[in-house]
């Protein structure tokens, strides 16, 4: 079983969408993967953005029960791979002690995944699609 962590800022938009999408793709492809998400500035227990929930639901992914987790509450060494949404997140995780060889920026060809926070549903759909495509490519490498 491979443990994967997705990290963004507040753990209410990008990283929970990534977790849900990864879980669905892993299930559909029968891959032994466990996904988790967290945020560098998360308020533990905060709900996921309604637009993130709606955008994922359109793909048959239910993230409505996910709650925000601060990354400092996790043992980063327990993860086989850590995907961040920006180069800034990557640098912050390495500063917190994450193994730099395990940390990658999701959607690197675009410099990461843009934050949809505060955007409309179409903004979240574009973000979801970028995350989906990036994870689909990344799973081939695991």
What do these predicted regions represent?
Residues 1-77, 140-142:
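Conserved active-site segments centered on acidic
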Residues 75, 86-87:
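Helix N-cap/beta->alpha junction signal
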Residues 81, 87-142:
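Phosphate-binding/catalytic loops
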């Amino acid at each position: 079983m491979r443990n994967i962590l997705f990290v963004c800022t507040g753990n209410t938009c990008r990283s929970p969408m990534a977790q849900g999408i990864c879980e669905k793709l892993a299930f559909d492809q029968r891959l032994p993967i466990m996904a988790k998400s967290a945020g560098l500035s998360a308020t533990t227990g905060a709900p996921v953005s309604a637009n993130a929930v709606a955008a994922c639901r359109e793909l048959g992914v239910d993230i409505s029960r996910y709650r925000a987790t601060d990354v400092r509450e996790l043992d980063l060494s327990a993860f086989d791979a850590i995907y961040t949404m920006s180069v800034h997140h990557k640098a912050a995780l390495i500063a917190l002690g994450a193994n730099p060889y395990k940390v990658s920026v999701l959607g690197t060809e675009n410099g990461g995944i843009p934050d949809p926070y505060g955007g409309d549903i179409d903004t979240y759909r574009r973000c979801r699609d970028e995350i989906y495509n990036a994870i689909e490519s990344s799973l081939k490498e695991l």
